[in-house]
Amino acid sequence: MTSLDYVHGYTEDEATRLADQAGTLADLLHHDTQYPEGSRVLEAGCGVGAQTRILARRSPSARFVSVDLSAQSLALAREAIEREGLSNVEFKLADLHALPFPESSLDHVFLCFVLEHLPRPEQALRALLRVLRPGGSLTVIEGDHGSAFFHPRSLRASRAIECLNQAQAAAGGDSLIGRRLYPLLQSLGLDDVRVSPRFVYADKSRPRWVDGFTRKTFIAMVEGAAEPALRLGLIDRTAWDAGIADLKRTAEDDGTFCYTFFKATARRP
């Protein structure tokens, strides 16, 4: 994946969205992610460090090496780690298909919201497994935009989401990859493959989720796909704006929103 392939873009708004998303989802996605003292953990595709901060705080005695293909994103990640006073993270500019680490040199591998942007996720996983020691753990977290359902129902809102899916597919990605994690990891011959769905539900009685997920994570993500969706001719501006307006209705007092993430773990034989 190159910077041009990231459908959400590398804007300041996207960096803010990623940070908001990570904070909102921290407990849901990471309550069972901890690494032992002294272990070396590779975070592949760390981006702006939104997940890095959570990992480093939750496993302060582990050593993280976080890699990304974007120097711009790595600079933001370093700033975020320094602001929080964390000292157990090292950043490297690297392509996860050609990692600068010896074979079997790392104890654990973690990646979150990365495979969805890659045209050949199996190939990327094989490259990651090369540097993972036998018996070491692999953790993969992905969403699945096909799992989004909401009230009030709206074909226009669903069309806007589908435009994001199509734009991501045009860039070589798969926004529905969450449902594929189990067969994907199984096909690589890994041991102890397990997938845990992580369900989000937001309504007026759960204002933190309405604001943090419905508005600042999901709707903001779809809004960020306007440029590629319009450029590719997937939709016109009037229909796009109507879809976004209907999506925003789901965050009002009578609205509801549901979504499922998938967290997969496995071990290298």
What are the residue ranges of the model-derived segments?
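Conserved alpha-helix/loop element of class I SAM-dependent methyltransferases that forms part
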Residues: 20-39, 54
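Conserved catalytic/acceptor-binding region of the Class I
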Residues: 139-208, 216
